[in-house]
Amino acid sequence: MKKLLATILALVMALGVTTMAWAEGDWTGSGTEADPYMITTEAGLNKLATDVNSGTVYSGKYFKLGKSITVTDWTPIGQKGTENKFAGTFDGNGQTVTINRINSSLDSAFGGYAGFFGAVKDATIKNLTVAGTINGSDVAGVVARLDGASKVINCINKAKVTGTSKAAGITVKIDGANVVIEGCTNDGEIKSDTVNGAAGIVVYAQGENFTINGCTNNGKISGPFVGGVVFNVSDSGSGIVKNCVNNGSVHSTNAGQNIMTAGIVSVNLKGSGLKIVNCSNTGVIEGENCSAICYSEYTNDASEPNTNSGEIKATVSRTISESTAVLNGDMSIGLTIHPYAAVTINSGNYSGSIESKGSLTVDGGTFIAGGNFYSSGTLVINNGTFARGVSVQTGTATINEGAFKTDVSCADNGKLTINGGKFAREIHASDTSTVNINGGEFTFNTNTNEVIDIKAGAKVTISNGVFAQENTNRFCPNNKDRLTVTGGTFVSDAMVTALMGEPINAPQATVVNGDKTMIAVGSAAIADAANSGKKVTITKGGEKIGRASCRERV
């Protein structure tokens, strides 16, 4: 009996000690993966912060949150600029830490970086939700700074985060190599008061080989420099952003500083060092220079397209960075099309400059004078009215129809094919470009300029088309040896002789169009004239053709 009483007393004392330890902020568990340190109180969280900030970083140790906890005057876990960075694994266990206030008196000691975690290195933070209000300099909901090969997995920020410098839902800065942020969501409102940036997931990514995968921003992002998922990938950063979504409104409040704003990554200084795949924007993007996915160029995998269904409210210029887009409305701002984007313009009035590095199809629209129209990708024009020059700089372009009131040019190693359309000014070919004219109506008639302008190295071939030029000396005054004419409809025998010489071996015919007589050379030109209802009489290389029988090519 005495032994039994002694045993019971020992158990009671042990339970009493355990209860006291919990009250003092200690944890249960041994810190292994199978038996992690279990934290269930504010005091327990404070103990972790105190230990890490004093140099005990718990490398290789495991922690689990046993219940949701509210903290006040919170001291972040880990410090920027020191070795006092959490290095273990923290499992939030689906629980929520609500932060009522960050201890602002510690701002300088933490280098301005604050959140639930201030700084971690080679750590894993997972399954954690942060709520409440977070204010400070460089602040985030979950972890302000990621060093080493840290991981943030399946974390959610619901806190309102306001930074006097930078603000993020998940992390302010990726500074280590091989950092992974996966399955994270921002539902909180994120605001930055300065030009240093705000974003739903990450403000600055400057570590090498980072991965941001399956993350979503649902919160409102506002400030001078902002991004939906990521604000800035620096020139020292590299990695991939994939399977991410921005559903929140992203509003740049700055004006006059040429600011870039986008739903997924606003600024990419790394160029091809950043890959964005299978991402989408549904939110409203508002600012000076806006894009759905990324304002800067990046690397894309065509098999994993990026998409946009959100409204883009740009005041200066818009970049189309999603994989496909259709434009129907008026646009007074500049438009840039990225190399991996395929865009169709169906209608609208466009007064801003257009630069296409991707695939652009124009099925209609009016392109007002004063802006540029450059293509260095793939361009197809099926219709439209162009009161500005069209310039093919590299790549390929095909014009099937449309009204061109000023010059069309091809440069560098570009290739331009003209199958139709009405052209009121010159056709220019320079550098090592190639221009093939297979049709179209060329109404330009000049005694001072030129219809076809060829610079050394370029080549122009004419197989068809109707040309109004009368002065034989001004049709192609430069580099005539680079011009080949095998057919077409011209104003006189003199034009035909000047372009092709005598004798003309191809079929030749007179074409009467109203009170005007022209000379058609070649089967294609004769058939086109006949099929358009004009009176055609073969004069060389064939027999007389009546209008009723002119539906076949000769």
Feature locations, PLM:
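Surface-exposed repetitive/solenoidal architectures
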Residues: 18, 22-347, 352-358, 362-364, ...
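Sec-dependent, cleavable N-terminal signal peptides
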Residues: 1-23
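A general, composition-driven signal for non-globular sequence regions
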Residues: 7, 38-40, 218, 382, ...
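Extracellular adhesion/carbohydrate-binding repeat motifs centered on closely spaced tryptophans
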Residues: 318, 332-336, 351-355, 368-378, ...
